[in-house]
Amino acid sequence: MFRLSHYLDQLYHPTPPRIARGTPKPVVIWNLTRRCNLKCKHCYTVSADVDFPGELTAAQARETLEDIGRFKVPALILSGGEPLLRDDLFALAKRARALTRVLALSTNGTGVIGSKADRVAEIGFDYVGISIDGIGATNDAFRGVIGAYEQALAGVRSCKRRGIKVGLRFTITEQNESQLPELLKLCDDEGVDKFYLSHLVYAGRGNKNRGEDADHARTRRAMDLLIARALESAEGRGHPLEIVTGNNDADAVYFLNWAKANFPAAQVAHLRKHLEAWGGNASGVGVANIDTQGDVHPDTYWSEYTVGSVKQTPFSELWTGPDPMLAELRRRPRPLKGRCGACAHQAVCGGNTRIRALQLTGDPWAEDPACYLTAAETGTATDIDRLTVRPFIGDRHDPKPAFV
């Protein structure tokens, strides 16, 4: 996750960068259930409104939660599917509140009303993220259910009335990019605390719909708008909205280039130190995933690669064990190839999102086709052939993944 507002603030109010020693404890994103009342086009878990066999039992989930607490992860995000559809969500969340420093809920928002909204407030979640992918019918088409927009908006308002910090999550595609200005206005009108723009990741239904990914021009236009909006908040103009992006760490380099054009060299050098201390893509390093079956992955999109299962081995042991793919992800620099391997900004970006490269080439270290930076911006040769996105036409037409 690229915290645009945070790093913009470093240009105005600089603080020393914090250099991590060794591998940090990860933020854990835990998919508690695959069941969901929506059918989103980008869903990486391919969720549906049915029961899925093999999900963690209440006892297994409690045991895993205690291990996470002892491991002292910096943050725990409870997700799904739709986590509010898991019967023991609030029991788990109440215990998690006592065990973790930061506790967040990732929801489609349609169920955060009435008594359930009261329970969310009582638990004391630090943050509730609600997904909205367009205004009105655009969101409903994206999420597969008519009325989903109004229900999610009701969830946002329920959170705000109860004093819960709430954010909107928006996945950008070619179909909804034009509505980004309206969504930012919605944040201002509703007093939303955070806006999270997610770039499309080619996992689950997101892979099947990868042909609808936003092209590079749309992505650059969206980033220009987000930077301008973050600047308003940094300068004390309008509603104070925190801006973050995810799943395309080229955003950090794009922002760095914007800073070069608008701030003195000394401030830009300070910003780069902070961005290098952050390091870009955090899969297998600062982010971990436990899926609904209890399988552990480098992040939520790495379902093709499993480190192990918490049904057999505690998460803490799996994460600190000798897994070869985790070891490769933690290398700096990473063993990147193609355009990413030749890029001058690997220390900032970390190689971007490896899953897009994996889906198109079978190689987790190939270049990321969603990098929208030009050859001049990356310092790469102009004659390097770009990896382009082929629309999905079936699994048998994609290369099989090859890991270490």
From Swiss-Prot:
Q: Which residues hold [4Fe-4S] cluster 2?
A: 340, 343, 349, 371
SMART domains tied to this protein = Elp3
| Pathway where it operates | Porphyrin-containing compound metabolism
Q: Name one Pfam family in it.
A: Fer4_12
**Which note does the record give on the cofactor?**
Binds 2 [4Fe-4S] clusters per subunit.
Keyword flag S-adenosyl-L-methionine: yes
Cofactor(s) required for function per UniProt: [4Fe-4S] cluster
User: What residues does [4Fe-4S] cluster 1 bind to?
Assistant: 36, 40, 43
Q: Does the keyword Nucleotide-binding apply?
A: no
* Keyword annotations: 4Fe-4S, Iron, Iron-sulfur, Metal-binding, S-adenosyl-L-methionine
Q: Name one GO biological process term.
A: heme biosynthetic process
An example molecular function term from Gene Ontology annotations: 4 iron, 4 sulfur cluster binding
Domain (Radical SAM core): residue spans on this chain: 22-235
The impact of changing residue 40 to A is:
Contains half the amount of iron and sulfide per enzyme compared to the wild-type
The record's listing under InterPro entries reads: Aldolase_TIM, Elp3/MiaA/NifB-like_rSAM, HemeD1_Synth_NirJ, PqqE-like, Radical_SAM_PqqE_MftC-like, rSAM
| Impact when changing residue 36 to A | Contains half the amount of iron and sulfide per enzyme compared to the wild-type
The family this protein is said to belong to: Belongs to the radical SAM superfamily.
* Protein's job: Involved in heme d1 biosynthesis. Radical SAM enzyme that catalyzes the removal of two propionate side chains from the intermediate 12,18-didecarboxysiroheme (DDSH) and may introduce the keto functions on rings A and B, yielding the heme d1 precursor dihydro-heme d1.
In Swiss-Prot or TrEMBL terms, this protein is called Pre-heme d1 synthase
